[in-house]
Amino acid sequence: MESVAKPATTKEGSAKQAAIVVGVLALGWFAIQVAFIPLFNKVRGGGSDKKDDDVNAFTPDT
């Protein structure tokens, strides 16, 4: 007789399964974000990869 895993039918099993699914979805979303950062930046209009420190410098209005 072959041993087959039973589906989670208890509240504890269901909560654990839901936590695993949410964790996997979050990890997948994060991986996609990291993988496509250069593409997302170009689509948003930040096509230049060069850092311009003068643009981010604080200049008070006096």
Curated annotation (Swiss-Prot):
Cytoplasmic topological domain residue ranges: 41-62
Cellular component GO terms, alphabetical: chloroplast outer membrane
Membrane topology per record: Single-pass membrane protein
Keyword Transmembrane: yes
Chloroplast intermembrane topological domain residue ranges: 1-17
Keyword annotations: Chloroplast, Membrane, Plastid, Plastid outer membrane, Transmembrane, Transmembrane helix
Keyword NAD: no
Positions of transmembrane segments: 18-40
Major location (coarse): plastid
Cellular localization per UniProt: Plastid, Chloroplast outer membrane
Protein name according to UniProt: 6.7 kDa chloroplast outer envelope membrane protein
